Amino acid sequence: MNLFFDTSALVKYFHIEEGTDKVTALIRNSDHEIWVLELARIEFMSALFRRYREHIINDEQLGLAISGFETEYSTFNVEPLNQIVASEAEALLKKYGKSEGLRTLDALHLGAFRLLAEEDWIFVSADEVLGNVVQIEGFRVINPCNKK
């Protein structure tokens, strides 16, 4: 099964918080192919530094999370951020930005997913707004923070 992670879900694999157990189980399952958009690398670093600035993690935890991410990232399937993805994201923003509150970076993740996804693909996100738009688009979603 192919799982496409946005950054809100991916960060839970490298920092213990709500949803970490579910994300860890999904990533470690050898039957799953893990996909991310190239943008996730930059967003991930930004999310870690925000947690550091907010004193949620300390310097040691920051270093461990970054090194763990860099090692694990090399095992993921990475979809490049390119003009085709950007065009898809723009179309999604025009369709859902006003009515559903879809945001720029979320539109990029969904744009890449929509270009890649086939029947067995699942989008993994802890973002309720993005997850809702993914479902409206007709795809399956796993929110690791949901207890179901």
List the model feature ranges, each with a label.
Residues 10, 40, 85, 109, ...:
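Alpha-helix capping/helix-boundary segments
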Residues 39, 46-98:
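Active-site-proximal, substrate-binding regions of enzyme catalytic domains
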Residues 2, 115-148:
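Acidic, PIN/NYN-like endoribonuclease modules and their adjacent C-terminal/linker elements
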Residues 76-126:
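Active-site neighborhoods of divalent-metal-dependent phosphate/nucleic-acid chemistry enzymes
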Residues 1-40, 51-64, 148:
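Short, well-structured N-terminal submotif of metal-dependent ribonuclease cores
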Residues 21, 46, 87, 131-132:
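Alpha-helical elements of the RecA-like P-loop NTPase motor core of helicases
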